[in-house]
């Protein structure tokens, strides 16, 4: 295919690069800001790169239970991811491949609930969680997020790919439902598994709202909530806040970069052919 | 894993159903007993693993939780909670049968956290705060009465009816045990004023009282010399008492009537004050503070970006001392300017309350702990000094001998105005305050309309809370 | 005979299916459905710290009369109406620019535009707060040093700018997913159609509108749905940046709900808002999903 490079292309490309710069900037600023001294962080004109990097902010950050926060985030995201993956792949498979009573209704309810922002059930959810005695624990975030039906929806999409003939052949061979699921279904939906896992992990990590409402104790905060708290306590000290923000952002960005193909796939599968 | 979890959950749910889905009283008690029964051990264990921080308490010990706003000053560079931990260590040494767990909270998200925790039944036992919120919790029946702590000796020692009344709810019982108090005031930067040749505008004699005319003169000089005035901060409710006192003082208005039964800010003086402030902001003498809250306004002041601030107290002075020195700024505290030169100041009262968590032993232990913090021979005065303000107990005397600045702050107590922070619906009123200022500053409505609207809504909030 | 056998099979399938669905339904019913029902029920009560009193539909009546609620509804709609077209065009532009590049470049740009989403609202807001700061912020400094403005502008506190300032952050934190979707679906446009059209002498614009755009329609509709829902939920930006100010200019329904629940302690009222918000979102997504559904089965 022949392509001539016109002025328009160059302008568009330049525009694209400027936009990229704006999108990278916050992350870049957090990373570099974490190593700047307090005075430098609010300096104008800004110091575009830390000329005299310092670890001072991290020392101050460590006087807070920042590592505990980080661990809480990892724990919450990890467990949520596990439960969501198992539960959703089972449900997604039958929704895609079985014909049963109530199927259509059930699926519509799931789809409707998916569109519902969880914030609207905030107060009752909090009441419920406290009835169970798990308010202000990691489970107060994990369990409600496991109820969110996006995973079911996504896994249904992936399960549509399972050839029906294969399932029927298995049935004729006398394979039980559980075996069919583990030996035929699972291998086929594996990419979906990866996509859902990473998707859940990232979304849970950044689910500020749930964390804000469900967690109180300083030792139980997640890293994002911890940073928001720091922002309020240390409003004067940008350096420490940046160090905290870096601690919240770097791990999750790293995870994203490592698994971005799965992630992209998850997003695409969850959407097209809806 | 999943199975255990589901079991635990199911059990927890059962417990819930059995306890009945009735009033909120039930919610606080369900959690604890459920964890004791064998069936729900899984849920209990899960919760503990998640937290992972519960240290084992000695057998038979009462465990209480203390939530503290950053009211005690910390030693330089120490994180929130360091001093509090020292108090706890000293208390636990004397009372080995009580274990105190500390949580530090901040002023921005703290109040909402407390609300959430009250709803969820996970609120602390002891809270260190001020009457505004504490009395509203009392009015909602969430607190333990502290009448037995207000002994005749204590009441006589405090000898200040207004202050004692601020610790009472409308049922006549005491719910807050006060430790220290001080007036809110404002502060100017000596460096800026000197550079703008405006030192003559302020009064450094006596109680440093001054008039609105002098204040306006100072604004003009600062502006001419290129300094920014303070922000009329109103992005949120943090620190709003400072700017509210500023508004009421400049033309001698009052937030409420003397009986604290009705809002009266829409009197002539209040409207005039808001009109004047709008004028000042439009002329660039003061900054439109719709993007700043009280804390951020103080940040700008101590960073040297603004020449004065309308939110200052001895506590803030000590918390920000280090930054001020770094930026080579000397802050001079002043009362608010007023038309007649006699300020009417709002004041803070620091004190403790005890939440009713349905456990008498905890309530007793909490009271003991509060008593220790306020009345221990060694720690009482020390704690007062850490709040950087003045003891409510007259018998403690002058805790800041020879400190001229503190002497000035102490002199302001005679200008205390009626304390309205315990008015019903106070919390709701605060949510109307800053939008009102924003409406005025951004020209959405005239000062008169805005303040009338505010007073209507605020008065409605009193009715709502009945 | 045949019918009953069929029913038997179907019955069996149903049993098995529900066994597989059980865990998902368990979580869903307890943590989504039950709170939803509780929310609807309590929205009929005057429900605060003191207790509950049944007041029928009063909360709803008051809500529609509540000026602040009306303002938040308008703000929310402005955010939706503002973010949806910009997001679509922006995403389309980036995707069109990058989908034919080599895989490395493509995934580079994909990552770049997804970065703010992954970084998380809290961390990103820390930086934006500084960008918008009237006195120390970089935006005012930049504009002043380029002589575009003379006086500092109070981005998040000025009634003319506040909502737009929020909108910009909202877009940067939500455009990542649409870009990924567009890149994927542009890659799916059959090459032969495009080439055939080019042979027929169609220019780039014609190729785009007549060949590519129709096959992008389902994706576009889906993007419209998710961006709409996303904008309806805008909360943390407001909570972290403006507290709804100035004078309720950035209060969204979601933020107002939060304020009512946690600052005014009016849980019943907050729940009523939640119900209405859910209905609005439900209705909008229903319409959009319908449209999507009919278009997709090609």
Residue ranges of predicted features:
Chain B
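C-terminal motif of bacterial Sec signal peptides marking the signal peptidase cleavage site
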Residues: 16-20
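Conserved N-terminal structural module of periplasmic/extracytoplasmic solute-binding proteins
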Residues: 21-139, 155, 340, 361, ...
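Hinge/lid segment of periplasmic solute-binding proteins
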Residues: 45-53, 57-58, 106, 130-185, ...
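Extracytoplasmic/periplasmic substrate-recognition and gating elements
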Residues: 62, 93, 99, 283, ...
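Helix-loop-helix "hinge/cap" segment bordering the ligand-binding cleft or interdomain interface
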Residues: 93, 150-154, 168-239, 253-291, ...
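Extracytoplasmic "Venus flytrap"/periplasmic binding protein-like
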Residues: 93-159, 173, 195-197, 201, ...
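Ligand-binding pocket segment of bilobal, Venus flytrap-like solute-binding proteins
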Residues: 218-220, 266-325, 353, 368-374, ...
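Long, aromatic- and glycine/proline-rich binding clefts that accommodate carbohydrate-like moieties
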Residues: 331-334, 382-435, 439, 464-465
């Amino acid at each position: 295919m022949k392509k001539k490079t016109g002025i328009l292309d160059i302008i568009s490309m330049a525009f694209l690069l400027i936009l990229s710069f704006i999108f990278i900037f916050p992350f870049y600023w957090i990373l570099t800001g974490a190593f700047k001294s307090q005075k430098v962080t609010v300096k104008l004109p800004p110091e575009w790169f830390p000329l005299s990097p310092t670890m001072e902010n991290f020392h101050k950050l460590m006087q807070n239970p920042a590592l505990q926060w980080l661990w809480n985030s990892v724990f919450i995201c990890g467990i949520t991811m596990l439960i969501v993956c198992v539960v959703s792949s089972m449900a997604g498979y039958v929704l895609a491949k079985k014909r049963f009573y109530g199927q259509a209704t059930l699926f519509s309810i799931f789809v409707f609930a998916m569109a519902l922002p969880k914030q609207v059930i905030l107060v009752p959810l909090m009441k419920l969680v406290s009835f169970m005695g798990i308010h202000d624990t990691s489970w107060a975030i994990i369990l409600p997020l496991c109820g969110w039906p996006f995973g079911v929806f996504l896994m249904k999409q992936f399960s549509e790919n399972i050839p029906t003939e294969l399932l029927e052949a298995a049935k004729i061979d006398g394979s039980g439902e559980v075996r069919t699921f583990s030996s035929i279904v699972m291998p086929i939906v594996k990419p979906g598994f990866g996509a859902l896992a990473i998707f859940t992990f990232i979304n849970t990590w950044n689910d500020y709202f749930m964390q804000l409402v469900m967690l109180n104790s300083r030792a139980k905060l997640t890293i994002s909530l911890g940073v928001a708290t720091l922002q309020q306590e240390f409003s004067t000290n940008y350096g420490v806040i940046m160090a905290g923000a870096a601690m919240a952002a770097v791990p999750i960005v790293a995870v994203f970069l490592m698994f971005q193909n799965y992630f992209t796939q998850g997003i695409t599968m969850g959407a097209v052919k809806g | 894993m999943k199975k255990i979890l589901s079991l635990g959950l199911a059990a927890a749910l059962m417990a819930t159903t059995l306890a009945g889905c009735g009033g909120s009283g039930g919610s606080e008690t369900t959690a604890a007993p459920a964890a004791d029964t064998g069936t729900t051990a899984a849920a209990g264990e899960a919760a503990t693993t998640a937290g992972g921080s519960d240290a084992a308490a000695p057998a038979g010990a009462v465990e209480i939780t203390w939530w503290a706003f950053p009211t005690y000053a910390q030693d330089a560079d120490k994180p929130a909670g360091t001093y509090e931990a020292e108090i706890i260590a000293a208390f636990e040494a004397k009372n080995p049968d009580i274990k105190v767990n500390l949580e530090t909270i901040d002023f921005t998200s703290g109040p909402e956290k407390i609300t959430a925790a009250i709803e969820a039944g996970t609120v602390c036992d002891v809270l260190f705060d001020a009457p505004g919120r504490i009395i509203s919790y009392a009015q909602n029946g969430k607190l333990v009465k502290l009448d037995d702590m207000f002994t005749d000796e204590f009441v006589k020692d405090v000898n200040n009816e207004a202050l004692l009344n601020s610790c009472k709810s409308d049922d006549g019982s005491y719910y807050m045990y006060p430790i220290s108090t001080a007036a809110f005031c404002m502060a100017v930067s000596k460096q800026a004023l000197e550079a703008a040749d405006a030192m003559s505008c302020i009064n450094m004699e006596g109680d440093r009282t001054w008039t609105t005319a002098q204040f306006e003169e100072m604004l003009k000089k600062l502006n001419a010399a290129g300094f920014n005035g303070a922000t009329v901060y109103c992005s949120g409710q943090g620190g709003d008492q400072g700017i509210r006192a500023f508004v009421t003082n400049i033309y001698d208005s009052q937030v409420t009537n003397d009986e604290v039964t009705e809002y009266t800010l829409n009197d002539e003086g209040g409207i005039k004050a808001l009109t004047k402030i709008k004028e000042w902001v439009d002329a660039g003498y003061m900054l439109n503070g719709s993007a700043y809250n009280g804390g951020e306004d103080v940040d700008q002041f101590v960073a040297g970006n603004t020449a004065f601030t309308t939110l200052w107290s001895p506590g803030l002075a000590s918390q920000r001392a280090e930054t001020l020195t770094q930026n080579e700024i000397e802050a001079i505290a002043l009362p608010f300017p007023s038309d007649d030169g006699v300020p009417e100041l709002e004041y803070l009262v620091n004190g403790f309350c005890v939440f009713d968590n349905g456990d008498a032993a905890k309530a007793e232990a909490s009271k003991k702990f509060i008593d220790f913090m306020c009345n221990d021979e060694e720690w009482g005065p020390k704690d007062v000094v850490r709040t950087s303000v003045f003891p409510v107990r007259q018998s403690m005397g002058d805790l800041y001998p020879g400190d001229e600045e503190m002497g000035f702050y102490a002199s302001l107590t005679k200008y205390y105005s009626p304390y309205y922070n315990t008015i019903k619906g106070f919390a709701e009123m605060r949510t109307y305050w800053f939008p009102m200022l924003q409406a005025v500053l951004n020209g959405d409505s005239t000062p008169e309309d805005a303040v009338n609207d505010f007073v209507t809504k605020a008065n409605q909030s009193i009715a709502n809370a009945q | 005979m045949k019918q009953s056998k069929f029913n038997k099979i179907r019955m069996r399938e149903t049993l098995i299916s529900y066994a597989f669905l059980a865990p998902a339904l368990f979580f869903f019913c307890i943590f989504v459905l039950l709170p939803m029902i509780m929310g609807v029920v309590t929205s009929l009560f005057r429900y605060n710290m003191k207790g509950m009193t049944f007041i029928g539909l009063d909360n709803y009546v008051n809500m529609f009369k509540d000026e602040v609620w009306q303002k938040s509804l308008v703000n929310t709609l402005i955010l939706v109406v503002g973010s949806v077209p910009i997001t679509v065009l922006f995403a389309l532009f980036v995707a069109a620019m990058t989908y034919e590049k080599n895989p490395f470049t493509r995934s580079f740009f994909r990552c770049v535009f997804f970065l703010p989403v992954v970084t998380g609202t809290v961390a990103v807001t820390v930086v934006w707060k500084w960008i918008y700061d009237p006195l120390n912020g970089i935006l005012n400094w930049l504009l002043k040093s380029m002589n575009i403005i003379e006086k500092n502008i109070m981005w998040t506190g000025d009634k003319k700018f506040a909502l737009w300032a929020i909108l910009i952050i909202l877009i940067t934190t939500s455009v990542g997913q649409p870009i990924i979707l567009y890149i994927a679906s542009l890659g799916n446009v059959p090459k032969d159609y495009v080439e055939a059209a080019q042979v027929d002498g169609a220019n780039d614009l014609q190729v785009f509108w007549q060949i590519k755009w129709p096959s992008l329609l389902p994706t576009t509709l889906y993007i419209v749905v998710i961006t709409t829902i996303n904008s309806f939920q805008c909360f943390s930006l407001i909570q972290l940046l403006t507290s709804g100010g100035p004078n309720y200019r950035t209060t969204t329904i979601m933020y107002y709900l939060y304020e009512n629940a946690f600052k005014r302690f009016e849980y019943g009222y907050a729940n009523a808002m939640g119900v209405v918000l859910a209905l609005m979102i439900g209705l909008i997504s229903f319409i959009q999903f319908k449209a999507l559904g009919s278009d997709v089965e090609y």
